[in-house]
UniProtKB/Swiss-Prot annotation:
Residues 107-140, 232-263, 490-767 are annotated as: Disordered. Residues 49-462 form the USP domain. GO terms for cellular component: cytosol; nucleus. Its EC number is 3.4.19.12. Residues 250-263, 690-700 have a biased composition (Polar residues). It comes from the Eukaryota. The keyword Protease applies. This is Probable ubiquitin carboxyl-terminal hydrolase creB. The lineage of its organism: Eukaryota, Fungi, Dikarya, Ascomycota, Pezizomycotina. It catalyses: Thiol-dependent hydrolysis of ester, thioester, amide, peptide and isopeptide bonds formed by the C-terminal Gly of ubiquitin (a 76-residue protein attached to proteins as an intracellular targeting signal). It comes from Aspergillus fumigatus (strain CBS 144.89 / FGSC A1163 / CEA10) (Neosartorya fumigata).
Length: 767
C-alpha cells in the first residue's frame, strides 16, 4: 500500500513487465563496407569468412586466408579434377551451414544483467571489485560476438565425390568450395576436418604447441603437389588425355594459368615455382659452372634498417669460396678458389618472400627474433635475374602479409592482412575480419612499438596499366573524401564554420572530471600504440574526435566563410576530368621515360662492370705472368749457384794441393841450389867439445860466412833489380824474425825444427 502511495508510475505486484522487442546487433565495419555490393558472385571473390581457432591454429588460418585470396590458386584448386556442380554444393551446404540465434546477443546481455542483479541483492555479499565490464573494442570481444552472431560453416569430407582419396588437398578443396558456394558473404569457417587430416599425416602438428607459418606454407604446397601427382598417376593414360567437363570459367582460368587442360598437375609449379641458378666461377681457369634448383618461396636474410630490395641484393651477392670452403673445379682437377652467386632464372607468378626473423644465436643457444626494420614496397620488380631469364621485367604487387606478433619463435600469434579485389585491405584475425586502411600495412616494418613484424610477404604479378589505373582510382577516392569532409563542416542552415572554431567549441565543454582536476597541461600521446582492432577500423564506426589526427578536419585546410566558395568546392569544374586524364597521361609518359632511363642505366652499369672485370682479368693475367717469370728466373739462379758451389767443392782440395806442391817444389829447388853452391867451399872443422847450446850461434855465423863467400863467388843476377836485396842475403828484419822464431820455438819446447836445421847444415858442410 505504501508503494502505491509513492507514485502512480510504480508497477503493481502482479503486473508483468513488457517484453523487449529483439533488436538486431549493431553493424560491424565490414558489414557497413559491404552494403553497396550487388548480387553474390559465383567465383567467391566477394566472400569474407573468418576461421575458428582450435588452440594455437592461427598459423594455419592466416596461410589459408592468403591462399584463398590468390585468385589463380583458388580457381585451380576448385577446378581440379572437376568442379562440383553448384546444385549439389548448395544441397551439401544446407546441411553444414548453421545460422546462430539472432537473439543470442540479447539473451547473453540479459543473462549478465540478471546475474549482476542477483549478486547485488545478496545480503552480506560485497560486490566483486575485480569484475570489470568487457571492452567492446577488444579483439576477444569481437571474436566472441562473431561466433554468436555470424553463420558457422562446417566442412565435410567430400573426397569421394572428387574421385580421390582423402588428403590435405581434398580438405583444402572442401574449404574453398564451401566458401564459394555459400549464400552469405560473411561468416566463420570451422576447419576442423582439415586440421584432423593435417595431424593424422604429420606428427609435428599433433600437439598444441606454437607452429611456424612459413614451415606450414612450404609443407602445404609440397603436399598439394604430391597429392595431385599421386592421384594423376593412378588414372589411365586415356582418361588423363581427355579433358573433363568443366564450366566456361574454369576453362578460361585454366588457360590463363598456362595449362593446356583443366586437370593438369602442373598448376602448382606454374604459380609458385621459380628457378634459381647457382653460378660458380673458378678464379684459376675462369670457367663458369651453373647448377639449377627450383624453389616455392624465397627466404632472405635480414639486416637492420634495410629493405626487401637490399635483402634480395644481398641474396644474389658474390660469395668468395676459399680456405676450407674451396670449390672443386672439374677443369683444373682440384680444389680452387672461386666466386659464387645466386640468380633467378625463371620468375614465379606468385612470389612468396620469407623474411628470416628468427636467427639462432650461439650465446643464448636458441632461436631469437630479430626486430629489424625492413621496408617492403607495394610494387616490386626483381633485378637479380640472369641474362637469359624469362620476362625479367615482371612487375609484382603486394597482396597479402602474414604478421607475427610475439617476442620469440616459440610463442605468439599470427594474423593476415590481405588486399581483396574491390574492397581494399582487410585484417583477418581468426574469427574477426575488419577493413583497414592501405597505410595500415606499413605498420609492420619492425620498428613500431609492439611485437608485430611482417613475416611472409605474398606478391602476385601485375601490369603497369593496372598499377596506373589503381593509382588514379585512389586519387579520385581521396578527392571525394576531401569533398565529403568539407561538406561536414557546413552547418545545418547552410553557412560554413571554421574548423578551428569547431575545435574550440568542442574543447570548451567542461566535464565533471575537469572540474575536479587542477588546471594544467594535459599529456597527449605522440605516437599511438599499435593494435589490431579499433585503432585501424572503419572511420565511420569510430566516434568523432576533433583532436584526433585521423579526423578529416585536421587533414583539410580551413574554408573561408563565403557561401559561394563552398558551392565551388562541392561541385568541381568539368575540366577536372580532362586534367586528371592529362595528369595520368603525363604520369604514364614519365613512368615510361623513367623505365627507359633505368634500362639505359642498367645497360651502362653492365658495360661498366664488364670493363672492370676485363681490366681486372688483364691485371691478374699480367700479375700472374710476372710471378711466373720471377719464379723461373729465381729457379735459374738457384740452379746456377748450386752448379758453381758444386764445382768449387769438387776442385777446392786439388787447387790447394797444387799450390802446396808448387811452393814445396820451389823450396826444394832453392835447397838444391844451396847445396850445390856450398859443395864448392872447403870443409870447416867442428869442435867436438861444443855443446848444443854453443853450436846454435856458431853454425849461424858459419852459415852467414858461407852465404857471403857464395855471393862473392857467384855471378851477379841481372834479372834482379839493382835496389832489391839479394836472395841469399837475409835482411835485418828477416834475421830478427828467424831469431825470434828460434827463440819462440825454444821457449815453447818445440826444438825439432831447430835440430832439423842444424842437421841440414851439418850435412851441407860435410858434403
Amino acid at each position: 500500500m505504501f508503494c502505491l502511495l509513492l507514485g502512480s508510475t510504480a508497477p503493481s505486484v502482479g503486473a508483468v513487465p513488457a517484453k523487449k522487442e529483439p533488436q538486431p546487433p549493431p553493424m560491424t565495419p565490414l558489414e557497413k563496407r559491404l552494403l553497396d555490393m550487388g548480387p553474390i558472385r559465383e567465383d567467391g571473390s566477394d566472400k569474407f569468412y573468418g576461421m575458428e581457432n582450435y588452440g594455437n591454429t592461427c598459423y594455419c588460418n592466416s596461410i589459408l586466408q592468403c591462399l584463398y585470396y590468390s585468385v589463380p590458386f583458388r580457381e585451380a584448386v576448385i577446378n581440379y579434377p572437376t568442379r562440383t556442380p553448384i546444385e549439389s554444393l548448395e544441397a551439401a551446404l544446407a546441411k553444414s551451414l548453421r545460422y546462430p540465434n539472432p537473439n543470442a546477443q540479447l539473451e547473453a546481455e540479459a543473462q549478465a544483467e540478471k546475474q549482476k542483479a542477483a549478486n547485488a541483492q545478496r545480503p552480506g555479499m560485497p560486490p566483486n571489485p575485480q569484475q570489470k565490464p568487457e571492452d567492446k573494442d577488444s579483439p576477444e570481444y569481437k571474436k566472441k560476438m562473431a561466433l554468436q552472431t555470424l553463420p558457422l560453416l562446417e566442412t565435410q569430407n567430400n573426397a569421394s565425390s572428387y574421385g580421390m582419396s582423402e588428403s590435405l588437398f581434398t580438405s583444402l578443396k572442401d574449404i574453398f568450395e564451401s566458401v564459394v558456394g555459400s549464400q552469405s558473404r560473411i561468416g566463420i569457417i570451422r576447419p576442423q576436418q582439415f586440421l584432423e587430416v593435417l595431424r593424422r599425416d604429420h606428427e609435428m602438428f599433433r600437439t598444441a604447441m606454437h607452429q611456424d607459418a612459413h614451415e606450414f606454407l612450404n609443407l602445404l604446397l609440397n603436399e598439394v603437389v604430391a597429392n595431385v601427382e599421386a592421384e594423376a598417376s593412378k588414372q589411365p593414360p586415356i582418361e588423363k588425355s581427355l579433358p573433363a567437363p568443366e564450366t566456361a570459367d574454369s576453362v578460361d582460368q585454366s588457360s590463363s594459368t598456362g595449362s593446356k587442360t583443366p586437370n593438369t598437375t602442373r598448376w602448382v609449379h606454374e604459380l609458385f615455382e621459380g628457378l634459381l641458378t647457382s653460378e660458380t666461377q673458378c678464379l684459376t681457369c675462369e670457367k663458369v659452372s651453373q647448377r639449377d634448383e627450383v624453389f616455392l618461396d624465397l627466404s632472405v636474410d635480414l639486416e637492420q634498417h634495410s629493405s626487401v630490395t637490399s635483402c634480395l641484393r644481398k641474396f644474389s651477392a658474390e660469395e668468395m669460396l676459399c680456405e676450407r670452403n674451396k670449390f672443386h673445379c672439374d677443369n683444373c682437377g682440384g680444389l680452387q678458389e672461386a666466386e659464387k652467386r645466386m640468380k633467378i632464372k625463371r620468375l614465379p607468378r606468385i612470389l612468396a618472400l620469407h623474411l628470416k626473423r628468427f636467427k639462432y644465436t650461439e650465446d643464448l643457444q636458441r632461436l631469437q627474433k630479430l626486430f629489424h626494420r625492413v621496408v617492403y614496397p607495394y610494387h616490386l620488380r626483381l633485378f637479380n635475374t640472369t641474362d637469359d631469364a624469362e620476362d625479367p621485367d615482371r612487375l609484382y604487387e603486394l597482396y597479402a602479409v602474414v604478421v607475427h606478433i610475439g617476442g620469440g619463435p616459440y610463442h605468439g600469434h599470427y594474423v593476415a592482412i590481405i588486399k581483396t579485389e574491390d574492397r581494399g585491405w582487410l585484417l583477418f584475425d581468426d574469427e574477426m575480419v575488419e577493413p583497414v586502411d592501405k597505410n595500415y600495412v606499413k605498420n609492420f616494418f619492425g620498428d613500431k612499438p609492439g611485437l608485430a613484424c611482417a613475416y611472409v610477404l605474398f606478391y602476385q604479378e601485375t601490369t603497369l596499366e593496372a598499377v596506373l589505373k589503381e593509382q588514379e582510382q585512389e586519387n579520385m577516392d581521396s578527392n571525394l573524401a576531401a569533398t565529403d569532409a568539407n561538406d561536414t563542416i557546413l552547418k545545418q542552415n547552410g553557412f560554413p564554420q571554421s574548423p578551428l572554431a569547431h575545435v574550440h567549441s568542442a574543447s570548451q565543454i567542461p566535464s565533471h572530471e575537469d572540474n575536479l582536476r587542477p588546471n594544467g597541461l594535459r599529456r597527449a600521446p605522440t605516437a599511438p600504440q599499435l593494435s589490431t582492432h579499433h585503432e585501424h577500423g572503419d572511420p565511420e564506426s569510430a566516434p568523432f574526435s576533433p583532436l584526433s589526427p585521423l579526423s578529416p578536419l585536421s587533414q583539410t585546410p580551413p574554408v573561408p566563410p563565403v557561401p559561394e566558395r563552398v558551392t565551388t568546392v562541392a561541385t568541381p569544374p568539368k575540366n577536372d576530368a580532362l586534367a586528371k586524364k592529362e595528369r595520368a597521361r603525363e604520369e604514364k609518359e614519365r613512368k615510361a621515360a623513367e623505365k627507359e632511363r633505368e634500362k639505359a642505366e642498367k645497360l651502362r652499369r653492365k658495360e661498366q662492370e664488364a670493363r672492370m672485370k676485363e681490366n681486372q682479368r688483364r691485371e691478374e693475367a699480367e700479375l700472374k705472368a710476372a710471378l711466373e717469370m720471377s719464379k723461373a728466373s729465381k729457379a735459374e739462379e738457384d740452379r746456377r749457384l748450386s752448379h758453381e758451389n758444386g764445382k768449387e767443392k769438387q776442385g777446392g782440395s786439388l787447387s790447394r794441393l797444387k799450390r802446396g806442391s808448387k811452393s814445396l817444389s820451389h823450396r826444394l829447388g832453392k835447397d838444391k841450389e844451396t847445396r850445390s853452391v856450398s859443395s864448392d867451399l872447403p870443409p870447416v872443422p867442428i869442435p867436438e867439445h861444443s855443446t848444443l847450446s854453443q853450436t846454435g850461434p856458431t853454425s849461424e855465423q858459419q852459415q852467414q860466412q858461407q852465404q857471403q863467400q857464395q855471393q862473392q863467388q857467384s855471378p851477379p843476377n841481372h834479372d834482379q833489380p839493382p835496389n832489391s836485396p839479394q836472395l841469399g842475403k837475409p835482411t835485418i828484419r828477416e834475421d830478427e824474425q828467424v831469431n825470434h822464431k828460434d827463440s819462440k820455438h825454444e821457449r815453447t819446447g818445440h826444438g825439432k825444427w831447430r835440430s832439423f836445421s842444424l842437421r841440414k847444415k851439418s850435412f851441407s858442410i860435410l858434403s
